[in-house]
Amino acid sequence: MNSNKNVACPMDCYDACQAEVIDDNIKGSKNNIVTNGKLCVNFAQLLKEDNLKTAIFENKEITLDESLKILSNKLKSTEASNTLFYKGSGNLGVMQSATKNFFTQYGSVLTKGSLCDGGGGLGIEQGRGAVVNPPIEKLIDSDIIIVWGRNFSVTSSHMYNLVKDKTFVTIDPIKTDIAKKSKIHMQINPKTDYELALLLSRFTHMQDMEDEEFLENHSEGAEWFFDITRNRPVVSYEATTGVPLSQVNELLELVENKKVSIVVGLGIQKYFEGAQIMRCIDSFAAYLGVHKKDSGGVWYLSDSSFGFENQLKIEGKNKKVSVAQVDFSSYDLVFIQGGNPVVSAPNTKSVIEGLKNSFVVCFTTTYNDTCEYADLVIPSSSFLSKRDVRLSYGHEYKAISDIVEEAKDNTISEYNLAKHLISEFGFKELKSEDEIIDYYKNTTVVHEEFESFEFIEELDIEPLYKHKTSSNFYLITGKSKNSLNSQFTIDNYVYLNPSSGFKNDDNVKITSPYGEADFLVKISEDIKDQCAFFYTGNKKTNYLTPNKADEESFSAMFQEVLLEIELS
Ligand SMILES: Nc1nc2c(c(=O)[nH]1)N[C@H]1C(S)=C(S)[C@@H](COP(=O)(O)OP(=O)(O)OC[C@H]3O[C@@H](n4cnc5c(=O)[nH]c(N)nc54)[C@H](O)[C@@H]3O)O[C@H]1N2
Ligand SMILES: Nc1nc2c(c(=O)[nH]1)N[C@H]1C(S)=C(S)[C@@H](COP(=O)(O)OP(=O)(O)OC[C@H]3O[C@@H](n4cnc5c(=O)[nH]c(N)nc54)[C@H](O)[C@@H]3O)O[C@H]1N2
Ligand code: SF4
Ligand SMILES: [Mo]
């Protein structure tokens, strides 16, 4: 391995770690303040992955060249508008979108929305114009960190390390690692976060803690927002949110005259009205005056490419379909890159049925669950053999990747595949790799604060509890320390509270309006009663989830569902 070279962790993770090769070993960089010399277990697992060594066509091993010919011929003989380009987030380097450039020019259908952060992102955009996190220094300079629907110490372990001595408050139905480290844990009922945000705003007003200067000079609609908070008697929130008023008082006492940060995660927005819910939380933050202070602020999964011009983008008139609702069977050819929709997309049964009825190309580093349904598998080169730049959705530092290992035979990078196809079809060429990488390396985005905050002024959210029967369970999913979405060490259990009446190792059948699947039970006090918890990557969970788009952002809403559980 070449020494003194950079390696960016390619994985979909807030931390976007920078590594470097030292004496033939890959080590976390000490110069990157977030990475701070350490990498995680998932990085170690990534290095040990059994990457594809040959291409596969109709279950037979073939060479890379043969696979590229089959792909070109198939694309030439298929109507472009009957093809779909589907990109997952297995590698988040900027060079990954080279192929999207080709498929845009070719005329494929593309996807819109997200399986991840789309709803919440839209909510922030509606209030502040763009989804941008404050500089990480402001998090480090705060006194109190409210962790809202995010498993902060697990899903961004490096960001957590920078602030681990702060006082934490966690709002989560599950007793997560960070909840156990918190001074207050509000074990909230699922999909009631907007109610808690309204209640907290009401208490903020009752205790004269609102930021009058911000409300007068930097915002619009605060009175309308405050009106919504007054719609209901204060005590009625206790039953619906499951959060005692005493804890609400405790939180406000804790934050009074303190520098406050709120780190919001996916958990609050895996629902139909995810954007409205996020906007309520951001509005509470605005009301309390968390924005525009020297320290503190609100963090979410920011738009990591904000302020950069996409060097691989090309304008096209391509049709776009919601990624949550993709019907793979309606295309003659489906090209899947860096994704594993058989496990990660909602409604596994319809995903599999769809894939069985289309010509499926998987462009991937490893033979994943989706490859089982592929006609053609093209091996992507390892991240160690690709030049790239990794931007972060957690903080403002970028990571750089040089080539530290020669690409394995019969593998190809995303950039080279795109270049090859573009030349085959005589399309407009890509910029050179040097030019693209230099642009991202040399461009610094200066943080600009939003001008004015727009409060949410109307609310229309249908709570899940309204339709929940006493035998129903809420579906909750969250990331695991030992896996990265569907990659690495997968846990297929359903986790239930002891009050569920089930016991360890029970075989249960779980049913939802969208499908059913069998699971083995693990009992845990950490799970709130009436919740069924599954780690992300569980091979069965998405048999239960709706392949429908949320209200406004075309994104998935994995938790907009109620479950029935019985012994099987
Ligand atoms: N180790 C590891 N790290 C990862 C990943 C991984 O797979 N493994 N995945 C990466 C990716 S792709 C992403 S997007 C990020 C996401 O990272 P996070 O934002 O932390 O997302 P999740 O773990 O999905 O969910 C966060 C929390 O929301 C809680 N929750 C669920 N429903 C509700 C609710 O209604 N209200 C509230 N208040 N909380 C709720 C869950 O219990 C969970 O603890 O993590 C990244 N980092
Ligand atoms: N029920 C439920 N479902 C969820 C979630 C949840 O919390 N609960 N989380 C959602 C979230 S936040 C996300 S982000 C999505 C993630 O969903 P996906 O984007 O589908 O991610 P993975 O399932 O991890 O699959 C990534 C694949 O990319 C491949 N890969 C890795 N590196 C490269 C590379 O360099 N090049 C190429 N071509 N391929 C590569 C790997 O082999 C791996 O199989 O899942 C979503 N699905
Ligand atoms: S913490 Fe995240 S970015 Fe850092 S090495 Fe692990 S997976 Fe990669
Ligand atoms: Mo994600």
Where are these regions (language model features)?
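A cross-kingdom feature strongest in bacterial/archaeal respiratory oxidoreductases
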Residues: 5-9, 141-181, 189, 320-408, ...
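A glycine-rich, hydrophobic/aromatic-adjacent loop/helix-cap motif
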Residues: 255-328, 390-394
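Short gly/ser/thr-rich secondary-structure transition/capping motifs
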Residues: 124-132, 317-321, 359-362
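N-terminal leader/propeptide and maturation segments of large enzyme subunits in energy/redox metabolism
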Residues: 207-244, 405-452, 510-513
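N-terminal export/assembly segments and adjacent metallocofactor-ligating motifs
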Residues: 1-206, 221, 244, 337, ...
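Generic, well-ordered alpha-helical scaffold segments in large soluble proteins
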Residues: 70, 74, 105, 148, ...
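Generic recognition of stable, solvent-exposed alpha-helical segments in well-folded globular domains
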Residues: 35, 66, 70, 97, ...
